[in-house]
Every structure is written in structure tokens, then in C-alpha cells.
Amino acid sequence: MKRSISFRPTLLALVLATNFPVAHAAVPKDMLVIGKAADPQTLDPAVTIDNNDWTVTYPSYQRLVQYKTDGDKGSTDVEGDLASSWKASDDQKEWTFTLKDNAKFADGTPVTAEAVKLSFERLLKIGQGPAEAFPKDLKIDAPDEHTVKFTLSQPFAPFLYTLANDGASIINPAVLKEHAADDARGFLAQNTAGSGPFMLKSWQKGQQLVLVPNPHYPGNKPNFKRVSVKIIGESASRRLQLSRGDIDIADALPVDQLNALKQENKVNVAEYPSLRVTYLYLNNSKAPLNQADLRRAISWSTDYQGMVNGILSGNGKQMRGPIPEGMWGYDATAMQYNHDETKAKAEWDKVTSKPTSLTFLYSDNDPNWEPIALATQSSLNKLGIIVKLEKLANATMRDRVGKGDYDIAIGNWSPDFADPYMFMNYWFESDKKGLPGNRSFYENSEVDKLLRNALATTDQTQRTRDYQQAQKIVIDDAAYVYLFQKNYQLAMNKEVKGFVFNPMLEQVFNINTMSK
């Protein structure tokens, strides 16, 4: 009897399978599945500057302050996260924070001022990209369990806002002590140790990462008991899995896949104004691109509007310079390169040492990068330059860029906090060359001085003048090719509610307040 009972539904299933499409079960209501193109490179907040990594790290840690939510919109203003209050001295050189008394790490131990002190000292000691947001001589003191004092040698205008970025995450001191031999870099590259609403439970490389709620988080309990970040390399596969209900969110889909989803109308495809920009690195540090005339020729050769219309299907706009529209300090009157073959040829004629070929590095990290590379190859061919395309694994490409081993490369950038510092100081300060931000290895003492001046005052009017003056110089020097700023588009299951987009936190989902 048991056999006959088990046989009939099996037989029925076989019959149905041969006559009807397979029905896919929806993801349970208490679970969220996010489809992403690639694994994180590292989960260490003191190392990662990649938004793709922040999908996991941001909800796993807390910081002293966090970005506010204004209704259903993300704000660039900040409010307390671990901090209940703070004050700055009149000269802006001392900042004192009082901690809330109910925050706990995922192992149940309380978050103390000493944890804040150790986390920042580790960040500065490691000295990777995230540390670049903070003064190198920053001093941190913990006079008691609930008080943290930061001392700066000079005013640093964006300081409060830097404390909301991922690098300012507070790490469990017990983990730092247990793995002290390498400053916990090995452990934290693959694990989380924070007090955020979620924590990493498991990571199967190339397959998925699983996040579960931190049982000791004092805030409202999340609606999701499990968040799965599935690694689905092919964009068409991410789109298909979203369409049939296997995943709830498909991240980083190219325009053609988003358009297909819009036509199907099974899921929501939302667009949000973004500060994320795409640009070309031109290696200023070595021949032949150490010649400004050649860099200008490339800038005038680039078909910006063709890329916006063709590659983005109009979902973006050409940049005018390094400070994007929507960020204070933007200069609508700044000189803007456009596709002008006559001007490109005029600059080319000035080039002393004309190259016959250049290399262009890109990866599959962004589906738009390959068509941009092909468009650049076509444009420069008209000047007589053969562009050799090198498609690499993203980690390999980043390594090459960090070493300055390239001619042209491509990247995306989005700010960690709402200040032109994130663009101007990172991209152009001579002490930030390589992966920290100055990926064109640009150096100009006049620009360095203006950028330092912009950090020495909290007077936003004066800071705007300094940044705009520096911007005019770097635009003329054609340090980079400023391509476009893109709207952020996200495809999501219609059942998912409560997502709040913050332009400071692309690819970061507020999974602790979302629901189905």
C-alpha cells in the first residue's frame, strides 16, 4: 500500500512534466534571495572599497552614524547608529561621541568605546582604501565605556559623514584578539564580526552567501529569517531566475535584460537617480599617456552621447567633469568634452610621441564595460591608434590597475558620503595613487594645494570655490575620460516591499526593514 500511494503522485508528476511547463515555487516570505554577478572580493571593512562587497558587510556591521531615511527615500544626512549624541569643538578638531548602551555584537558582548577605538586603530594601521577617508594622524581615545573622542590635527570638513561609510564599521574586539597575528585580516576577509542586524552564516564561493539575523540586535527584528546572496554570473540567467520566481532581486542587469523584464511586466523595474559614474583611467605616469595632448585627443574622440543612447538606452547622462550633477560643488559651466573629431585631430597633431597602439583593460564586473571598450577601440582607430583589448578577471584587473600596469582601463565609482571629497580628493591627490582612488596616477602640485585647502575649512562656499578651481585644471589636463553618470535600475519581485535606495549605498539593501 505504501508503494502504491507513493507511485501514483510520482506517475502523475511525470505525466504533468511532459505536458506542461514546470512551475517554480516562489521564495518563502521569510526569506530573501538576491542574485549577484560575482562573489565579494573581501568582507573586511578595513580593506574593501567595492559596493559589491558592501551588500554583505553593510548590514552586518554598525557604525557611529548612519544615513537617514526620509519617508521612502534615502537621505545624505546622518543620524546616530551606535552613537546617541555627539559634539564638535569650536575649532572642529575634537569630536566626542556618546554611545548607546544597548548595542551588542553577534556573540552577545556589548559594543563599547574600546571596540570603536580598536576598530579605527586597525583601519588606520592596515591603511587600505577605506582608510583614505580619514586623516592619517587621527587619534582615538576611549575615556570610558560609552565615550569616544577623535582628535584631528586640523579641521577635516567631511569628518562626520565619513563615519557613515563601510570602512567605519565597528568590529568585535574578541575577534581582533583571537586573530591578532595578522590583524584578523584572514578571518575578516571571509567572515563578519559586527553588531548589525544580520551576520554571515555561510559562504560557498561561486554559489551563495547566507545571512541570518543577529539575535542580539536591539532594534526591530527583521522580517527575513534568511537572506541568500546567490552568485549567478550570467546576466541572462539572473533575469530568467527572477522572472520565474527563483530569486527576489536581480542585481547589475544590463539594459537589454532590464528591457526584457519591463516587457514581461512580471516584476518591478525601478529607476533611481544615482551618483554612480563610469569613467576611463588614462595612465598619466608613463609614456605615452603622460602626454596631456594625447589624453585630450582621446577625450575629444570619445562618443559620449552615443554611449548614453546606445549602451544605456538613454538611462544616464554625460559627465561634465569629476563632480557629478546632484553633488554640491557641481559646476554647470565647466568645460565639457564632446565627440569632436576635428578637435581630436588637432590635439593629436600636437602629440610629440605618437603611439601606434594602446592596451585597454576591462573585466566582466559590469556588462557595459565591454561595449564601452569596443566603442573606444573604434573611436581611437580613426586617429590611427590600435587599441588592444584585454578582458581579465576583475581581481586581476584591479591588481594591474593598482600597480599602474596599463594604458587605459575602466571603472565605476560611487561616493561613500555626500561630499565632493569623494571624487576630487580621491581621484587627484598625489598621495592616493593606485587603488585608493587616483587610478590615473595624476600629479599636480597646484591641484594638491587646492584640495588640501578644501579640507581645512567647513565653509561650504569656500570649499566649492576650491573644488571648482581644481576641477577646471584637471579637466584641461584630461586626467581621465569622464563618460557618464548612470541611473540605478533594479529589478525586484513585486512582492518585496520597503526597499529604500540611497545614492551613497548602491548595491546595499536595507534587508533589516524590507519585507514581502
From Swiss-Prot:
Q: What is this protein called?
A: Probable D,D-dipeptide-binding periplasmic protein DdpA
Leader peptide range in chain numbering: 1-25
Give the chief site where it resides: periplasm
Which proteins does it associate with, and in what oligomeric form? The complex is composed of two ATP-binding proteins (DdpD and DdpF), two transmembrane proteins (DdpB and DdpC) and a solute-binding protein (DdpA).
> Origin organism of this chain?
Escherichia coli (strain K12)
Q: Which domain of life is it from?
A: Bacteria
UniProt record similarity statement: Belongs to the bacterial solute-binding protein 5 family.
Function in brief: Part of the ABC transporter complex DdpABCDF, which is probably involved in D,D-dipeptide transport.
Q: Which biological processes are named by the entry's GO terms?
A: dipeptide transport; protein transport
- What compartments host this protein? Periplasm
Which UniProt keywords are given for this protein, alphabetically ordered?
Answer: Peptide transport, Periplasm, Protein transport, Signal, Transport
Question: Where does it sit, as one GO cellular component term?
Answer: membrane
Q: Which InterPro entries match?
A: Peptide/Ni-bd, SBP_5, SBP_5_CS, SBP_5_dom
MF terms in GO: peptide transmembrane transporter activity
Q: What induces it?
A: Induced by RpoS in stationary phase.
Is Zinc-finger given among the entry's keywords? no
